[in-house]
């Protein structure tokens, strides 16, 4: 078990006083301890891995436990998906080249024994060969020109079939958008890469290409927002963003800029939306819900407990609010080093609930069956945990203003929305799906640092929404963006037929796929 470190209370004013005093005279023993403790705490926070919050990683194994008593996997247990080499069927985007035998045909006499006939096998021998290539390639066509010596008429060779009139075709815009807004590669970095590969592609040119493409495929994003508004469960959250040139509306005293993420689930599918500006996640969700059909049942909203994530809805419009269990759990993870025994109890109790939810997911339970399952198995656990939390405060076992006390009060204050999954079918446990979606915006912020203008941010939101929705529904985002540009007229006429989950069927009906 990890031992709790000595606690040193310090604030920024004290640190400023210590640093100012160090200019005049050597540090006292007390000031030295404060400064050293603050630096050690900062280093510990920076070094702490945010990717592993499992109870065993946070607190270690409990005393007296041993690996000998742990459940060992069966020798014949099925291996989890994702392990081992990729088979040929995994290369869905690869070019398929069938190769016939040069000398034999199905049903011909065997050249080896001369007695039997050869028949095609069900499974051919498969070879996979992977080659490298530039993200954007170029072809230079040299069209021969002939000039008459008498009349001066010039005759130019015809360009090859399939060469379009535009210098940058639809695939160029799709690839730049995929790299920039899907993979976090800034324009300047792609410019350097292409330059090294002998393909000049200035950052300004890249922006012009994606800006033009965004205008063409805008109807698809607008339809995506409309369909997201009809969702059964809506997750939302936001993260900070930076926009260099952003005009402020008269009377607007907000200084922050945010990228809001919304993930809407509907009929088992998921839609991801991004909105960048001064509005918070709740306000952006409210704008989306304005397009919701009045005949639909009340949706579930999943978010953390911040008030800015809850939309202000007009009279007659309702939502069922659910709060994120992972945020409540993280309150105890953050103070586990100082309160190991109490935090272990809470984390293990919540672990049981997550275990039940994982079992329901593995068994592919319907929302109603999942609700019944949680009521049978998770409700007693949560009731026991609630009684324990109340006893910690009521019986003064925990100081209310301590880190543990604040974590306990967080759960108690938001207990009803935290436990919506025990009362409403389909209510999720946490908001992790939108946290993962926001990583795309965080990746852009980390690599590109900022958007230059709000218009640039809106272009980024459009592409991120389409690309991440493709990822959620298993579609090829590069192919999808390409086809939207190629069929811009059809997209404008009927955008509902050009969603990431149905555009292939639309192409097949048109005889293009």
Feature names for model-found ranges:
Residues 120-122, 156-159, 243-245, 271, ...:
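Short helix/loop capping segments that flank catalytic or ligand/cofactor-binding pockets
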Residues 46-49, 110, 148, 176, ...:
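Mobile genetic element proteins and their domesticated derivatives, centered on retroelements
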Residues 68, 194-199, 209-312, 318:
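RNase H-like nuclease fold core
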Residues 303-308, 312, 348-513:
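Acidic/histidine-rich catalytic cores and adjacent linkers
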Residues 184-193:
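Short, charged amphipathic recognition helices of the HTH superfamily
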């Amino acid at each position: 078990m990890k031992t709790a470190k000595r606690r040193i209370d310090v604030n920024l004013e004290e640190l400023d006083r210590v640093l100012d005093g160090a200019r005049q005279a050597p540090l006292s023993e007390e000031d030295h301890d404060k400064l050293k403790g603050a630096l050690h705490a900062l280093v510990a926070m920076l070094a702490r891995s945010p990717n592993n919050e499992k109870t065993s990683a946070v607190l270690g194994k409990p005393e007296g436990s041993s690996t000998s008593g742990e459940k060992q996997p069966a020798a014949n247990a099925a291996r989890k998906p994702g392990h081992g080499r990729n088979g040929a069927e995994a290369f869905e985007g690869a070019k398929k080249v069938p190769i016939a035998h040069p000398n034999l045909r199905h049903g011909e006499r065997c050249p080896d024994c001369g007695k039997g006939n050869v028949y095609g096998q069900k499974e051919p021998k498969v070879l996979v060969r992977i080659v490298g290539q530039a993200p954007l390639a170029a072809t230079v066509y040299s069209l021969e020109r002939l000039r008459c010596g008498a009349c001066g008429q010039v005759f130019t060779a015809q360009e090859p079939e399939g060469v379009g009139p535009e210098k940058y075709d639809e695939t160029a815009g799709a690839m730049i958008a995929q790299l920039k807004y899907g993979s976090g590669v800034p324009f300047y970095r792609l410019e350097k890469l292409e330059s090294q590969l002998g393909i000049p592609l200035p950052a300004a040119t890249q922006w012009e290409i994606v800006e033009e493409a965004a205008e063409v495929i805008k109807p698809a994003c607008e339809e995506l927002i409309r369909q997201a508004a009809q969702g059964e469960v809506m997750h939302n959250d936001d993260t900070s963003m930076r926009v260099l040139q952003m005009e402020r509306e008269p009377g607007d005293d907000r200084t922050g800029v945010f990228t809001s993420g919304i993930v809407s689930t509907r009929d088992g599918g998921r839609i991801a939306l991004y909105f960048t500006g001064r509005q918070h996640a709740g306000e952006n969700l409210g704008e989306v819900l304005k397009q919701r059909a009045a005949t639909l049942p009340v949706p579930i909203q999943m978010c953390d407990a911040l008030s800015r994530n809850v939309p202000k809805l007009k009279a007659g419009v309702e939502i069922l609010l659910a709060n994120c269990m992972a945020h409540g759990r993280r309150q105890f993870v953050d103070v586990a080093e100082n309160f190991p025994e109490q935090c272990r109890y809470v984390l293990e109790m919540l672990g049981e609930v997550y275990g039940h939810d994982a079992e329901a997911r593995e068994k592919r339970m319907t929302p109603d069956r999942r609700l019944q399952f949680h009521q049978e198995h998770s409700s007693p656990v949560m009731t026991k945990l609630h009684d324990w939390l109340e006893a910690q405060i009521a019986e003064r076992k925990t100081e209310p203003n301590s880190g543990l006390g604040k974590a306990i009060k967080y759960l108690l204050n938001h207990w009803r929305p935290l436990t919506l999954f025990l009362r409403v079918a389909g209510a999720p446990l946490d908001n992790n799906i939108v946290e993962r979606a926001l990583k795309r915006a965080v990746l852009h912020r980390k690599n590109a640092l900022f958007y230059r203008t709000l218009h640039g941010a809106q272009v980024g939101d459009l592409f991120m929404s389409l690309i991440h929705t493709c990822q959620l529904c298993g579609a090829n985002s590069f192919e999808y963006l390409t086809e939207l540009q190629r069929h811009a007229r059809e997209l404008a006429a009927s955008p509902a037929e050009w969603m990431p989950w149905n555009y292939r069927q639309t192409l097949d009906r048109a005889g293009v796929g």
